[in-house]
A protein has these predicted regions:
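Membrane-proximal helix-loop-helix interfaces that form the catalytic/acceptor-binding platform
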Residues: 2-67, 71, 77, 89-417, ...
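Catalytic-domain carbohydrate-binding cleft regions of carbohydrate-active enzymes
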Residues: 422
Length: 560
């Protein structure tokens, strides 16, 4: 059967007509014909390579017998939970679904609007053949297109895939946690993530981050199974790893660092345990499948992908978004906003994380590497490439962070519970973790509402200003001019702004993402912050730094 699959994939690669397929894609794509033809050739080669890999992996896989594991320890002693534990975890996932469906139709933010305009309402042909912006999370764009096509162009339809992927990541965390800790700790970690305002927010964001989180957890679970195994199990685990890892990469390209981290850990384990030679091949085939599936998924858009991602974000512009210190501050501020007690609670959480890291390090250093190394590689490479370093790039590690936090609570209770309290340590740890979950749930109201309130800003200006007196800048252009269809003027440079001002008694300027505007249009930013302009109204949403600012200039007679 495996050979038949391999031959079928190779046959598809051989018969696919390059020129005709490229022309068909070009009829709807944002890319030029030459780029698409190159992509079709890559797709043919990737398909042939994938088919050959299927055949080779089946031919050279271990056929039987037992061998040493690359990593000792296996599953947690409590890895086979009772039906009650599974039922409780399922109930938590249902609660998580309800929390993520509430207020799902609230206002979109810029990246979501960009996804809706470019991919949500476009043809599927355009979606699978275009990669003209770094904002394209390819797998999510496809899911969003299917959802919007079936349910209509609404905010909730655009976000529905993120909700589903977010809820699936809760169940995935539960199953992963059973491999490394007790059912009680696994359940509490799942509950904490279910009521986390950050996880709810990402699950209501039409981007690929919850899909990447799901893939990260599933791929890590399969990786553990691979390095733990002591007997041949066929291609089930290698193919499962390849599918999970490539799905994450298809969601967001930075997931490649997850695979790179696993590969580095595998090399280290092979070096430490030379006696486990029999367990090297299955893990090798897992990485081969991850590479082949990822290349196959990106093949058609790969020429565009390389061109789009090879350059730095906002080239030639100085911005705090590339500063690691800014990223640390922003991450801290975002986490503090989602915790009762703010920064004090965050500092206390840091102590618990340190204890949790120590505990997992004592349990297995390889586990610690699985938890931490992907995030370290992501930060290192993104900074080296000159790209903006967003805290959301590390959301794929949220499940691991929660596990570390819950372990830290157990260790902290163990350190503090002395004397007559020793016998109550487990109950006290449960109580402390439950209180943490309740406290986290108390911050959920801050999560709901428009991520950016473009609708309110548009209505405000419609009531107070004539259309010919209103102009937009940079990241305000798409939401107002394209998505809302406002008949306002687009300003591209300082000269355009000054010409727009000329002859008008009153000028209204609407902008968003002030940090971005200050970086890409410093001259305009300087003029808008001069004494000639004042802030008329600021519209805040739940997205940090995404405020919409309406500025007004009243002519003093100098322009007539």
């Amino acid at each position: 059967m495996v050979i038949c699959w391999g031959l079928a994939i190779i046959a598809v690669a051989l018969v696919l007509p390059v020129a005709r397929t490229g022309q068909f894609l070009a009829s709807a794509s944002a890319a030029d014909l030459s780029s698409l033809i190159a992509g079709v050739w890559i797709f043919k080669l990737a398909s042939a390579a994938l088919g050959a890999l299927w055949i080779a992996a089946d031919a050279f896989r271990p056929s039987g017998g037992e061998f040493d594991a690359l990593l000792e320890g296996g599953r947690s002693d409590a890895a086979a939970p009772s039906r009650r534990w599974n039922a409780a975890a399922l109930a938590i996932c249902v609660l998580g679904l309800l929390l993520r469906c509430y207020d799902l139709n609230s206002g979109l933010w810029f990246d979501e609007i960009d996804t809706l305009v470019r991919y949500g309402s476009a043809s599927m042909t355009r979606v699978v053949s275009s990669f003209e912006t770094q904002n394209n999370h390819v797998a999510y764009s496809i899911l969003a297109n299917l959802s919007v096509g079936a349910l209509g162009p609404s905010a909730w339809a655009l976000r529905l895939p993120a909700v589903i992927l977010g809820v699936l990541s809760l169940w995935a965390l539960w199953r992963f946690a059973l491999r490394v800790t007790s059912p009680a700790e696994a359940l509490l970690a799942t509950a904490f993530l279910a009521v986390s305002s950050h996880h709810v927010s990402f699950s209501q964001d039409a981007r690929g981050y919850t899909g990447m989180l799901l893939a990260s957890i599933v791929a890590s679970a399969v990786f553990l199974e691979l390095v733990w195994q002591r007997k041949a199990t066929g291609l089930r685990l290698p193919v499962s790893y390849g599918l999970a890892a490539s799905f994450g990469i298809w969601m967001h390209s930075t997931a490649v660092f997850l695979v790179a981290a696993h590969f580095a850990i595998w090399i280290w384990l092979c070096w430490r345990r030379p006696s486990a030679r029999g367990n090297r091949a299955p893990v090798f085939w897992a990485f081969a499948f991850a590479t082949a599936f990822s290349l196959w998924a990106y093949a058609v858009v790969l020429p565009q992908f390389v061109h789009t991602l090879s350059g730095p974000s906002m080239p030639g512009q100085e911005t705090q978004w590339r500063n690691p210190l800014w990223m640390i501050r922003e991450t801290g501020a975002g986490l503090a906003a989602g915790l009762p007690g703010g920064w004090l609670a965050l500092i206390e959480g840091g102590v618990l994380l340190a204890l949790g890291l120590w505990s997992y390090g004592q349990q297995r250093r390889a586990l610690l590497a699985i938890f931490l190394l992907p995030a370290v590689l992501t930060a290192t490479v993104v900074l080296a490439q000159g790209h903006n370093l967003w805290p959301r790039f590390f959301f794929f590690s949220a499940g691991f962070a929660v596990l570390i936090l819950l372990r830290g609570i157990s260790e902290f209770v163990g350190l503090c519970a002395r004397g007559p309290l020793v016998g109550m340590r487990r109950g006290l740890a449960w109580a402390a973790a439950t209180l943490l979950c309740l406290a986290s749930a108390a911050t959920l109201p801050r999560t709901y509402g428009p991520k950016q309130d473009f609708e309110a800003a548009g209505a405000f200006l419609q009531q107070r200003a004539a259309a010919e007196d209103v102009a937009t800048l940079e990241m305000a252009n798409l939401p107002f001019l394209v998505h809302q269809g406002r008949p306002w003027t687009q300003i591209d440079d300082l000269q355009g702004l000054m010409e727009f001002e000329r002859g008008k008694d009153k000028v209204w300027i609407v902008l968003t993402m002030p940090t971005h505007l200050a970086a890409v249009q410093p001259d305009i930013w300087k003029r808008l912050n001069s004494s000639e302009y004042r802030d008329e109204q600021v519209f805040f949403g739940t997205k940090r730094g995404g405020e919409i600012v309406v500025k007004v200039r009243v002519d003093t007679g100098r322009d007539h």
